[in-house]
Structures are given as C-alpha cells and as structure tokens.
Amino acid sequence: MNTFADYILEEEELGSKMEIAYYLSKKEKVFFDKSIVFKTEIARLFLNYSKIEVDKNFVLTACLLCNCKKVDNAQDINKIHTYAKEGADYLREMGFGKRFCKVCEEINRYSNSNPRERESDILELVDQFGGMLLDRPERIGFKPDEALVLLEHRNLKDEYNRYLHTFIEFVNFLEKIQINDLVSMTALRRLVKIHNETEELTKFIQKVVYEFEPKIDKLIAEQNEEIAEEMFSKVEDANRPLFSEETTRKIMAHIHDDPRMKQEGQV
C-alpha cells in the first residue's frame, strides 16, 4: 500500500504537488501557508538557473514539507529551535525516507546535524532569503539586495553554505528580469506583490503556477538568449587569419633576417 510520501513524491507537476500539501495541512493541521508556496517558487527558479545536480522533484517536495511543524509565532523561541527536528520526525511517520527527513531537519542548524546534505543548503538559502522578502508583524519585507547582504553577512556569517555565492548570482540575475503588466517591476517584486495581494492560499497557488511561472520562464529564456547572442557577437569570425596581412609580412621579414632560422634551414 502506498504511503503519503509515495503519493506526493510520485506527483511531478508542481501545482498538483502544492495542492496535495495543502490538503494535508487541512487534514493533519500541519503548517502550510502562502510563504511556503512563495519560497518553493524561488527554489524552482534557483534550480532551473543553477543546474545543480540534485533531484529537483525531491528538493521541491522537501521545500513544501520541511516547515510542517513550524508555528507562526516568532516569539516562541523554543519552538523555533525544535520545529525542524519535530517536522522530520513527523515526516518519517508519514513514510518518508531517512535521507529526505534529514534534509528537512537541516533547513536550519539548530539540531546540529552534520555533515549537512547538499539539498539542505538549498532549502536553507531559499527559506531565509524568501522569508526576509515578506512582511512580518514586526517589520516590512526587505528588498532583495538588502536581504542578500543580511543573508551573507549576518545569517550565514559564521556558517558554510556550498551554494551561497551561486544563489547570490541567481538573485542578481533575477533582478534584471522585468515583468510588464500595468506597471513594470522586477520578477521578485512581482512575486512579492502577488503574495501580498492574494488572500486565499489556493488562489495564490493558481496565480503562481498558471500565471507567474509561464511568464517568468519565458522572460528568463529570452534573457538567456540575449546573453548568448551578445557573447557570440563578441567572437570574431573563426576563419579570420590569426595575423593581419601587414603583421604577417613583418613576421616573415623578421624570420628571413634571423640567422638562427637560416642555420636551421627554415628559410
């Protein structure tokens, strides 16, 4: 008999996977809100950009479920320190494998689990960066460049994350992508705007999967094409002689006058 773990891992379409996680949250009272969908979309974009050799389906499923025992209360310090471990234990009961649960536990570093899995480093970056972009009761969301500075020089100042610099490159790349609707704005700002203006979780999922994703994927493809064309335009004709005709004459004259060449019988 298939477990819940089998069911959600076998579903490779991200929108359907999000719906499964949503219905689990209703049945089991686990944590699943718009911020999870928001962060998972950032994870999807990062995986597409970076081409890191990981199982994309595995990572996105973990991104949807790793916060399952989180509480929406920043003042509950004890819970902040334990929710990742509690979530991993819960997911193990739901049929997920040991490594999947370890990856979810390592979304933060409170359990001191080492050595860290590489997928955990992806979850950590997405969770911390994505969280800083969103408003919280005690503060408004940070701009992407501000969030990157805090991520690198505060949150991970004394920690090693193998994908940090790749993630910074990814965010800087994404900040160059403009989405034009009624008002032109960057891709991340647009995603934040959709998050803030869409109250219902199910509607937010639909807007992300069926409106935002096709648009941003097309724009990224166009941006990559422009970059490739720019690179190729800088490459001169491969059949062009290495030296100009004038340079060739000078070199040949020099060789002709060089006594070493005459001694070796090359002239």
Annotate each PLM feature.
Residues 59, 63, 91-126, 130-237, ...:
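Histidine/acidic-rich helix-loop-helix segments that form or flank divalent-metal centers
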Residues 1-92, 253-267:
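Acidic/His-rich, divalent-metal-binding segments that scaffold phosphate/diphosphate chemistry
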